UniProtKB/Swiss-Prot annotation:
Its EC number is 2.1.1.325. Gene3D superfamilies: Vaccinia Virus protein VP39. Specifically expressed in the corpora allata (CA). GO terms for molecular function: farnesoic acid O-methyltransferase activity. Pfam families: Methyltransf_31. This is Juvenile hormone acid O-methyltransferase. It comes from the Eukaryota. One of its GO terms (biological process) is juvenile hormone biosynthetic process. InterPro entries: Methyltranfer_dom, SAM-dependent_MTases_sf.
Amino acid sequence: MNNADLYRKSNSLQKRDALRCLEEHANKIKWKKIGDRVIDLGCADGSVTDILKVYMPKNYGRLVGCDISEEMVKYANKHHGFGRTSFRVLDIEGDLTADLKQGFDHVFSFYTLHWIRDQERAFRNIFNLLGDEGDCLLLFLGHTPIFDVYRTLSHTEKWHSWLEHVDRFISPYHDNEDPEKEVKKIMERVGFSNIEVQCKTLFYVYDDLDVLKKSVAAINPFNIPKDILEDFLEDYIDVVREMRLLDRCNNNVGESVSIKFNYKVISVYARKLCLSLM
């Protein structure tokens, strides 16, 4: 997941869903009259951070995009970092530095939190990033076929050693029958108020197998060497076929193949109220 240029070319699903989330929930954000401090967690190449700016007041104070990958941050700073927008390395599951604590009025995160094993630690850090009266808007994966494909491949002799720790890279909510309840419980425990959690089923159609393979390669969390990556992607497609996720349709040119994924996304809006108002 460190190839920023490949991610930029292959993140159409992530950008589409971030845009939908903002269209649906941006009106809930409690913007200040001037000088909003905003942080985007898991910014990757910075392209979604650019989308976020469209929904922010023009007189915002600063926008900080963060990612655990140094390569992603370098790419984002080069292509999107200017003026009041900057990017830095941050592990949201790690310790926050003093300059980050209570340093923001709004926290956004799109397609990142499902990679985090310690969910309570991540939500507590989000809470601590916010100043009083701050709020957050988050979007992450629940159940999705990509995780089932990973699991299937991890049980094969060929790929077991490479995918030995597969559960580290599967959403904590993939097998949860009531993710809304679980997320809300964690956030209440951390201290959030006005919590709204929605789990929705969406679908996305990849136009052909090559597009799917590039998308899988762009977010591949496993340390698979380049010389066998194509082999891994071919086996990935074979599992997709076995799971009957391929839709074949005929047209005037000939037979084409599209891949339709149904998956669940979890959206969250919540606030950090001042203690005197609680």
